[in-house]
A protein has these predicted regions:
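Short, charged, amphipathic alpha-helical segments
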Residues: 44-56, 73-84
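Amphipathic alpha-helical packing elements
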Residues: 56-57, 63
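Active-site machinery of serine-nucleophile hydrolases
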Residues: 144-147, 151-183
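Extracytoplasmic/secreted envelope proteins and their assembly/folding machinery
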Residues: 13, 17-20, 24, 58, ...
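A domain-start/cap signature at the N-terminus of enzymes
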Residues: 2-6, 67-68, 72-145
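Intrinsically disordered, low-complexity coil segments
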Residues: 29-49, 108-110, 121-124, 135-144, ...
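Sec-exported extracytoplasmic/periplasmic mature domains
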Residues: 25-35, 62-70, 88-95, 153
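Amphipathic, heptad-repeat alpha-helical segments
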Residues: 1-54
Length: 183
């Protein structure tokens, strides 16, 4: 059982809960629109496929609130950042973006980090993942490449919020196996 976190104040918690609820509301509006769309089943299937890539973020924030596991004041800004990512992904999905565009995977000369979610086959919940994408990967290239995948396990103070935050910034902290050892 994770230890109790710090008191971050009711006002901050209320603001995060409202922002998480807004993400969920915006997502539901997309689902409802797809149900009435002429191509409803295709549009709805696309949204269902992309749903974990969005809703894993408010879930992480809500779980952190429910379990009172904010371990530093910085975790509040991390939570805000994750909800911003969810909103940006909703905007991209509404614009018809591909999965790669939704998760911001592009061709880059730099390492990239992807953080998102998948739907658990055990309990249908959204579970976080992180992927380290090596530099110089072309998203349309069919050649096999090494990508390191991180799944959230158990940690005394590693909430899903902390996991998603860690795996969505600072790619320099990861080695992809095809680069020289640091000096």
């Amino acid at each position: 059982i994770p230890p109790a976190g710090i008191d971050v104040g009711a006002e901050a918690v209320d603001a995060l809960q409202a922002n998480a609820a807004m993400v969920r509301k915006r997502w539901q509006q997309l689902i409802d629109a797809a149900k009435t769309d002429k191509q409803g089943s295709t549009a709805l299937a696309r949204l269902i496929d992309l749903e974990p890539e969005v809703l894993v973020f408010p879930r992480a924030v809500e779980m952190t609130i429910e379990q009172s596991i904010f371990y530093s004041p910085k975790a509040l800004s991390d939570a805000d950042r994750l909800l911003e990512i969810a909103n940006e992904r909703i905007d991209r999905i509404a614009a018809g973006a591909s999965w790669a565009e939704v998760v911001s995977l592009g061709t880059s000369n730099e390492k990239q980090l992807l953080a998102g979610g998948y739907r658990s086959k055990i309990d249908d919940s959204f579970q976080p993942y992180g992927v380290v994408v090596p530099a110089n990967v072309n998203v349309v290239d069919a050649l096999p490449i090494r990508m390191d995948v991180w799944l959230h396990g158990r940690g005394e103070k590693v909430s899903e919020l902390a996991f998603l935050n860690k795996h969505s910034n600072r790619p320099d902290r990861y080695r992809t196996g095809n680069e020289p050892m640091p000096q």
